[in-house]
A protein has these predicted regions:
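Mid-to-C-terminal alpha-helical segments outside catalytic/metal-binding sites
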Residues: 308-352
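Divalent metal-dependent hydrolysis catalytic cores, especially in the metallo-beta-lactamase
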Residues: 72, 76, 90-113, 126-137, ...
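Catalytic pocket-lining loop regions of alpha/beta-barrel enzymes
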Residues: 199, 204-274, 292
């Protein structure tokens, strides 16, 4: 005896339901994060960096005499496209409270002359706050118009132009990532766009920083900038991490021979390790007059800017730096690099 229409319909529904349950169960099994079954690609270095999920580091309220009158030329802040610990108003107020003379706001993706104007006006009147621009992909890479815009922003507070940082070809290739990058050189020579940007930096009397390029590229940039008439040059933290600029002692010596100032980021001195050892050795060998100290702090889960600077000062002092050396590295050289008089009224020691 055959099945009725109703019975056939019921049987079909049961079959579909069983198939759905089996598929759902298989989906649940396949979603279990077992290494043997996972088909997801691991997060890249940059994705991990952008999606930090760590608790904030409390302010330790550290102080040091070197901070009084200091200028931090490398201050990260919110708003940003990945987690920062404090916003621009908060970091400026904290720096002012600890006795700093000023800061330079830095963002990898946009200019900060505008934020500097607002911070000065509404958060810290009388405190020196300056802006900058970094030539990463968000501003068009090696885009001379981005430099011109910084010069035109109300307040005239732009001071530093960074060559590409997180989007530099060097960093992207070092981390083996597949994302857009900014190339500054080809076959051992700067690309034409780099030379055009350098010319605009010279025209507007900005300070030029080398960014996260390879060591040999940094030297190409410094030589071209000096030839173009750029007056103030920074080698961006070349003793910090190899995915950024990592220079040999000979390359550092060549940089200072070109008149550049070498950045020490406080983050490299907060923990023992290769970066700290390399930094202290470079200062001992080349002399404090060629260096300046910035924080490069601001990531969620890490020390804040003022605590970082205080620890850096103590580390340098413990390694043999004199109080005069600390004044040069925390106060005089940074002042020169943002076109302010030194506390003593003269030029920075290296620039004399």
């Amino acid at each position: 005896m055959g099945l009725t229409t109703v019975e056939r319909f019921a049987s079909r529904c049961i079959e579909i339901g069983v198939r759905w349950l089996i598929a759902a169960a298989l989906g649940m099994v396949m979603s279990v994060p077992l290494h043997a079954q996972s088909t997801e690609a691991p997060q890249t270095h940059w994705e991990q960096y952008k999606h930090r999920n760590v608790p904030p580091q409390p302010d330790q309220h550290l102080t040091d005499p070197a901070l009084v009158g200091a200028i931090d030329l490398h201050v990260h802040h919110d708003p940003d496209s990945y987690p920062r610990a404090v916003d621009a108003f908060e970091v400026a107020r904290a720096a002012q409270e600890r006795g700093l003379r000023g800061i330079v706001l830095k963002n990898h993706w946009t200019e900060t002359g505008g934020p500097a104007y607002l911070v000065r006006k509404y958060a810290t009147p009388g405190f020196e706050v300056f802006g900058a621009v970094t030539l990463d992909t968000a501003v068009g890479g090696l885009n001379p118009q981005a430099v011109r815009y910084l010069a035109d922003v109300a307040g005239g507070l732009g001071r530093i132009v960074w060559m590409p940082t997180h989007d530099s070809e060097h960093e992207v290739r070092y981390n083996n990532e597949s994302r857009p990058f900014v190339r500054v050189s080809r076959d051992g020579a700067l690309v034409s766009e780099a030379n055009e940007v350098i010319a605009v930096v010279a025209e507007h009397d900005f300070t030029l920083a080398t960014g996260h390029v390879a060591g040999d590229e940094a030297l190409l940039i410094l030589r071209a900038a000096k030839a173009a008439g750029v007056k103030r040059l920074i080698v961006t933290h070349p003793m910090f991490l190899p995915q950024y600029t990592y220079m040999s002692l000979d390359q550092l010596r060549a940089s200072v021979d070109l008149g550049a100032y070498i950045e020490i980021v406080g983050r490299s001195l907060t923990k023992d390790g290769e970066s700290k050892d390399k930094t202290l050795a470079a200062v001992r060998t080349l002399g404090a007059q060629h260096f300046f100290v910035s924080s490069d702090a601001g990531l969620v889960g890490e020390l804040n800017q003022t605590d970082t600077l205080a620890i850096a000062a103590k580390a340098l002092r413990a390694a043999g730096a004199s109080e005069a050396d600390l004044t040069i590295m925390f106060k005089d050289n940074p002042a020169y690099l943002v076109k302010l008089p030194t506390l003593g009224g003269g030029a920075a020691p290296h620039a004399r």
